[in-house]
């Protein structure tokens, strides 16, 4: 048990628990169950307070990745884990400043929002019994009690659970994980049975009268009385026969538990149909940039000025012509739209002073491309509720699409290194509290691995485009504004560079609700010939607009330059999330951190330096038909980042559903690999739930194909 505790808990928690036990003359090596219980209780107290702050207005907020400039105060003061003298000093100080009554016993936390002390309980027994014991011991209505159990139950004073559901779910999941880990090492039974009640119980708590009647009425089905139910709960064996538990739940439930063996799972069925097409809001691996180094022109930093300067670096423009039409569109309109952009940029240059923004003339081609006057007229419901055959218009089922090879190629490209740096070191942001040495060291190592990654370029491009589009949508609602697609980076030598990918023209944008749509036309430069993979470009009309001279090993070669044009749309909420794409950096950093933590707890010292600097070691990156792919720690960082970025770029209901449902199957397979002998019922229903999300989304189809590779290798 002692080894388990040292592996399972953060070294800081283990150290605090050892200190606390020594303070009471107890030995962690002998009283190992108590050691585990104290660590668990400490961790729950810390998780309870994590991410909860009070802002300048005194409102309670949850912040998982802090804005370094926000003036935030921690919502909870942690008293548990301090030595007794310090803990009482903190309690006395709180009582003096807030006027709250001083508690008889040391509580665990103080809540600055609700102005009350909190006693946290973690029990291996029945929450109600433990709650009553705590209440009896404290005998104070001022201290709020919150009990968690290892089975996911909780109980709190007046059913006031203080925290939001997600924060509490995090605690319950962690407790459930600890229990599973103990069970897999055959430690759980002894730990469960070792819990003693609160020593200060004086009388048995009897329920009488009306409360007793209510208790009898509110029992689950099949229980005649409270005694009967209590006896069942006391004798409830969590790892007993699941069928028995189900039969006690309800007469309706009829589930037969099937053993889940290596031969049980089948691969997911991916849809047949035409190959899937690109649906990201901007080009990824196929994008081409017109760039200026060390920009110092007049108006540098104003997007329109930067764009014109970038356009002037290219001399190979030619009369545009359509090389790949859009099947359903009026293609000449796309051609005329590009010619209009060129003409209006020329007009700007002829003006004495270049304006900061450019609104396009409302030509027929732009009105068509932006869907002007195409939306059906809205009628007030009161005016038509008497119409007999009023119904929602029929919409077609989405056509199933099959996985195309371009999706994996896009992902591989996103993991690669470019020759420019896309984020400065402080992009991930400092913590509100002074960040300790280890955390900043990890951040710097991680940033060094991903700053040149193509996925990081996509983040900065996405942030820029979404910010510019949302600004324009609010500032120029009726105008067809021309928005350059720009990014900034640094070259290997540290020189600043401004890049132009193309342009967006925004349609009318009276966005009242979060989901109201603004249409836009995107026009993006590329060297990719669309005729090589026409299925990828189904939604695009592609023009040839120039010839570019490229330096190669054999000298200069001329390549045609293409313009990928399409009509697209987005909403306020999508743009808001697009502006927050930097969060992907944080998410992947946290995933890497948990790998370092696992390694550190085994070695019992911080392994950050060794983790990043041992270049010879390889790590698992993912599954492919060839087996488990491995790579350097840098490759792991970039792959995790690319996954996070693609989840953002290709966010969809299909992805939400697939992630949630496939995770269940993944956990069952993991349990089988850990020899936990999992059992399932209605596995067919789970497969159905997963496969109904596999329709036409390229990123979901690729993830499903990876999942099948994982199944094959995991069950060998």
Curated annotation (Swiss-Prot):
Its cofactor is Mn(2+). It holds the Pfam family Flu_PA. A motif (Nuclear localization signal 2 (NLS2)) lies at residues 184-247. One of its GO terms (biological process) is viral RNA genome replication. Coiled coil: none annotated. The active site is at residue 134. Influenza RNA polymerase is composed of three subunits: PB1, PB2 and PA. Interacts (via C-terminus) with PB1 (via N-terminus). Plays an essential role in viral RNA transcription and replication by forming the heterotrimeric polymerase complex together with PB1 and PB2 subunits. The complex transcribes viral mRNAs by using a unique mechanism called cap-snatching. It consists in the hijacking and cleavage of host capped pre-mRNAs. These short capped RNAs are then used as primers for viral mRNAs. The PB2 subunit is responsible for the binding of the 5' cap of cellular pre-mRNAs which are subsequently cleaved after 10-13 nucleotides by the PA subunit that carries the endonuclease activity. GO terms for cellular component: host cell cytoplasm; host cell nucleus. Mn(2+) 1 binds at residues 41, 80, 108, 119-120. A motif (Nuclear localization signal 1 (NLS1)) lies at residues 124-139. It is found in: Host cytoplasm; Host nucleus. Its main location: host cell. InterPro entries: INFV_PA (IPR037534), PA/PA-X (IPR001009), PA/PA-X_sf (IPR038372). Its EC number is 3.1.-.-. Endonuclease activity is inhibited by 2,4-dioxo-4-phenylbutanoic acid (DPBA), RO5-1, RO5-2, RO5-3 and EGCG. Inhibited by some N-acylhydrazones. Inhibited by 5,6 dimethoxy-2-indanyl. Inhibited by RO-7. Inhibited by Baloxavir acid (BXA). Inhibited by Raltegravir derivatives. Keywords: Cap snatching, Endonuclease, Eukaryotic host gene expression shutoff by virus, Eukaryotic host transcription shutoff by virus, Host cytoplasm, Host gene expression shutoff by virus, Host nucleus, Host-virus interaction, Hydrolase, Inhibition of host RNA polymerase II by virus, Manganese, Metal-binding, Nuclease, Phosphoprotein. Binds 2 manganese ions per subunit. GO terms for molecular function: endonuclease activity; metal ion binding; RNA binding. It comes from Influenza A virus (strain swl A/California/04/2009 H1N1). It is an enzyme of class 3 (hydrolase). It comes from the Viruses. Mn(2+) 2 binds at residues 80, 108. The keyword Transcription regulation does not apply. This is Polymerase acidic protein. Disulfide bonds: none annotated.
């Amino acid at each position: 048990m002692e080894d388990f505790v040292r592996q399972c808990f953060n070294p800081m928690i283990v150290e605090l628990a050892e200190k606390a036990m020594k303070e009471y003359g107890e030995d962690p090596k002998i009283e190992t169950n108590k050691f585990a219980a104290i660590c668990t209780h400490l961790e729950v107290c810390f998780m309870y307070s994590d991410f909860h702050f009070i802002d300048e207005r005194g409102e309670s907020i949850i912040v998982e990745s802090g804005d370094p400039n926000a003036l935030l105060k921690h919502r909870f003061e942690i008293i548990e884990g301090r030595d007794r003298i310090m803990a009482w000093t903190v309690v006395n100080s709180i009582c003096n400043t807030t006027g709250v009554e001083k508690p008889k016993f040391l509580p665990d936390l103080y809540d600055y929002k609700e102005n009350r002390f909190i006693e946290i309980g973690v029990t291996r027994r029945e929450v109600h019994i433990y709650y009553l014991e705590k209440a009896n011991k404290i005998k104070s209505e001022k201290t709020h009690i919150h009990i968690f159990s290892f089975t996911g139950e909780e109980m709190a004073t007046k059913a006031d659970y203080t925290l939001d559901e997600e924060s509490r779910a995090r605690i319950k999941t962690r407790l459930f994980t600890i229990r599973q880990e103990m069970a897999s090492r055959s430690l759980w039974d002894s730990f469960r049975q070792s819990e003693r009640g609160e020593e200060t119980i004086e009388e048995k708590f009897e329920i009488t009268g009306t409360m007793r009647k209510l208790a009898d009425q509110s029992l689950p089905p099949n229980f005649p009385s409270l005694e009967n139910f209590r006896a069942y709960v006391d004798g409830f064996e969590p790892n007993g026969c699941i069928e028995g538990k189900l039969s006690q739940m309800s007469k309706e439930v009829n589930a037969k538990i099937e053993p889940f063996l290596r031969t049980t799972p089948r691969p997911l069925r991916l849809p047949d149909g035409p190959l899937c097409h690109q649906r990201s809001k901007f080009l990824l691996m196929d994008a081409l940039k017109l760039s200026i180094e060390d920009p110092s022109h007049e108006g540098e930093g104003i997007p329109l000025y930067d764009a014109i300067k970038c356009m002037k670096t290219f001399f190979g423009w030619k009369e545009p012509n359509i090389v790949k039409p859009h099947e359903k569109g009026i293609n000449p309109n796309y051609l005329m739209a590009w010619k209009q952009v060129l003409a209006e940029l020329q007009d700007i240059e002829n003006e004495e002073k270049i304006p900061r923004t450019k609104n396009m003339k409302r030509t027929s081609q732009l009105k068509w491309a932006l869907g002007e006057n195409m939306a059906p007229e809205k009628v007030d419901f009161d005016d038509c509720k008497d119409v007999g055959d009023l119904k929602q218009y029929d919409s077609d089922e989405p056509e199933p699409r099959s996985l195309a090879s371009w999706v994996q190629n896009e992902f591989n490209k996103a993991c690669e290194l470019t020759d420019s740096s896309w984020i400065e070191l402080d992009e991930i942001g400092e913590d509100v509290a002074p960040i300790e040495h280890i955390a900043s060291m990890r951040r710097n190592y991680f940033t060094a691995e991903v700053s040149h990654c193509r996925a990081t370029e996509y983040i900065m491009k996405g942030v820029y485009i979404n910010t510019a589009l949302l600004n324009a949508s609010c500032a120029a609602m009726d105008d067809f504004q021309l928005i350059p697609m720009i990014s900034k980076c640094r070259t290997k030598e540290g020189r600043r560079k401004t890049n132009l990918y193309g342009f967006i023209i925004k349609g009318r944008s009276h966005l009242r609700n979060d989901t109201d749509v603004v249409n836009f036309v995107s026009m993006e430069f590329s060297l990719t010939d669309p005729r090589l993979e026409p299925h990828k470009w189904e939604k695009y009309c592609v023009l040839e607009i120039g010839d570019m001279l490229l330096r190669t090993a054999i000298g200069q070669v001329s390549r045609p330059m293409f313009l990928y044009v399409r009509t697209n749309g987005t909403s306020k909420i999508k743009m808001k999330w697009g502006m927050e794409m930097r969060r992907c950096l944080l998410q992947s950093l946290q995933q890497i951190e948990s790998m370092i933590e696992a390694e550190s707890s085994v070695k019992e010292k911080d392994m950050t330096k060794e983790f990043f600097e041992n270049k010879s070691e390889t790590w698992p990156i993912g599954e492919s038909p060839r087996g488990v792919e491995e790579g350097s720690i840098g490759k792991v960082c970039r792959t995790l980042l690319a996954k996070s970025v693609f989840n953002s770029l290709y966010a969809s209901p299909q992805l939400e559903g697939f992630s949630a449902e496939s995770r269940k199957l993944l956990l069952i397979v993991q349990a089988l690999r850990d020899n936990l002998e999992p059992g399932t019922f209605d596995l067919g229903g789970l497969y159905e739930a997963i496969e109904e999300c596999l329709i036409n989304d390229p990123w979901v189809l690729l993830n499903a194909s990876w999942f099948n590779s994982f199944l094959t290798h995991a069950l060998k």
